[in-house]
């Protein structure tokens, strides 16, 4: 398959690109060109996705079997991309977030649980709603907290920094809040697994590790 990845040079995109190339797919990245491709020989189309006219100019005429939209935060990010390829792409995989769910004491969250319209990830919800209303063969991925090598967010690095400097680790609340983590390689593998899977079309999937932990347990 010829596959377009929006981004592809930071964290999740690095491992997704590597796995898709290993599986024999022809991968094309679209990004600003600020970082090298994670795999040599991968084609890179340079542009700014926040400029719809430039996006159309750069991508119109290209043919892709599948698209991974890893960095669309708002509907305005993703809609122009969908409008270009909605009549031709076989599978559009959208990176959403497990942060869209309404706070609940019933854990773990299931895909059908209530969502929070005031979530800071509202743009993700708007995009999912838009994709559902379009004639687009899409799958939405909702990952939990992702960790692993080359993480550009100071998540695990923050903890290790305090540990090596013998600094205390503050624990929110009473320490019994439940959270769940997922390794970046497992997320990339899950994203790859939806390709050529007809049952994944127009579906939403939570992706996380198998175990949960309290903040006390994490500390």
Q: Model segments located where?
A:
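Conserved beta-loop-beta element that borders a ligand/cofactor-binding pocket
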Residues: 128-150
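A conserved pocket-lining segment of Rossmann-fold NAD(P)-dependent short-chain dehydrogenase/reductase
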Residues: 162-182, 194, 206
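NAD(P)-cofactor binding segment of oxidoreductase domains
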Residues: 62-112, 122-130
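Rossmann-fold cofactor-recognition segment
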Residues: 41-51, 71-73
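N-terminal Rossmann NAD(P)H-binding glycine-rich loop of SDR-like oxidoreductase domains
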Residues: 3-23
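N-terminal Rossmann-fold cofactor-binding loop
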Residues: 30-35, 48-49
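Glycine-rich "substrate-gating" loop/helix at the edge of Rossmann-like oxidoreductase active sites
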Residues: 144-153, 173-185, 209-211
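Mid/C-terminal beta-alpha module of Rossmann-like enzyme folds, strongest
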Residues: 193, 197-219
